[in-house]
Design a protein with these regions (language model features):
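Alpha/beta-hydrolase active-site loop
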Residues: 64-88, 115-116
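Short, surface-exposed "cap/lid" segments of acyl-processing enzymes
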Residues: 2-42, 58
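Short beta-to-alpha linker loops that shape the active-site pocket of alpha/beta-hydrolase fold enzymes
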Residues: 22, 50-54
């Protein structure tokens, strides 16, 4: 009640799980900011997982493009979000509620991974009345995505290389543990490796800030085939 006005919770029509795009700073995590997605999903129960590596798990490395792990993380968040709603809301979901998952960029890859999880775990799909996913512009196949980056030979989003490699080395030590970053990156990159590592590990820098730093310090070639915001 506020100024003699009584507010009532409105029963959500469905659960919408929103998978966020690529972030590198903890301040951008859904639990640490005010995501605009909450304003555009309508009369729904909106649940946005931070992913491992942000929020309460900031001290852990983020498994970037490890879709299977991020999907499991999201399913856990779905259950936790619903439990919180059930505890604090003065209403219930509408009787014919369903669940969908949406996302773009990294969130698109994770949204599709959640859909695959539901397809292969029908007991979860039944409990959550899973209806559909909307996955946009996502790296659905990380290895093919990286292959296409290399085919193009240049990028305006250079952080994707170290971010992906660091994640994969941490996620699959049995496969990639025999390699070191020193074997995979240029001398120019290795000269500022400590700075780059700090920018990722501190979780204090946005993707824009990290990309700017990489472009500024590693862009050693300028020619007519490169725009101002691209790097080989």
């Amino acid at each position: 009640k506020n100024n003699d006005t009584i507010w009532h919770d409105i029963s959500p029509e469905k659960i919408v799980m929103v998978e966020h795009f690529t972030i590198t700073s903890d301040a951008e995590a859904p639990t640490q900011c005010s995501p605009y997605e909450i304003l555009v999903t309508g009369n729904t129960l909106t649940i946005m997982p931070d992913y491992i590596g942000y929020g309460l798990t900031r001290h852990l490395p983020h498994p970037y493009l490890n879709h299977e792990l991020c999907a499991t993380n999201s399913i856990d968040a779905l259950a936790a979000g619903y439990t919180l709603f059930d505890e604090v809301a003065s209403c219930e979901l509408k009787e014919d509620w369903t669940t969908c998952v949406i996302g773009a960029s990294q969130g698109g890859g994770n949204a599709l991974a959640v859909h695959k999880f539901m397809d292969t775990n029908p007991e979860y799909a039944e409990v959550w009345k899973f209806e559909y996913s909307y996955a946009a512009a996502g790296p659905y196949n990380p290895s093919l995505t990286m292959e296409k980056y290399f085919e193009k030979g240049k990028t305006s989003y250079p952080l994707v290389y170290p971010f992906t490699l660091k994640s994969m080395m941490q996620s699959y030590p049995d496969i990639l543990g025999k390699y070191t970053e020193e074997e995979m990156f240029s001398d120019e990159y290795l000269q500022m490796k400590d700075t780059i590592d700090y920018m990722f590990e501190s979780k204090n820098f946005t993707t824009a800030e990290i990309n700017e730093g990489l472009l500024k310090n590693l862009r050693i070639t300028v020619d007519e085939n490169l725009s101002d915001d691209e790097i080989y």
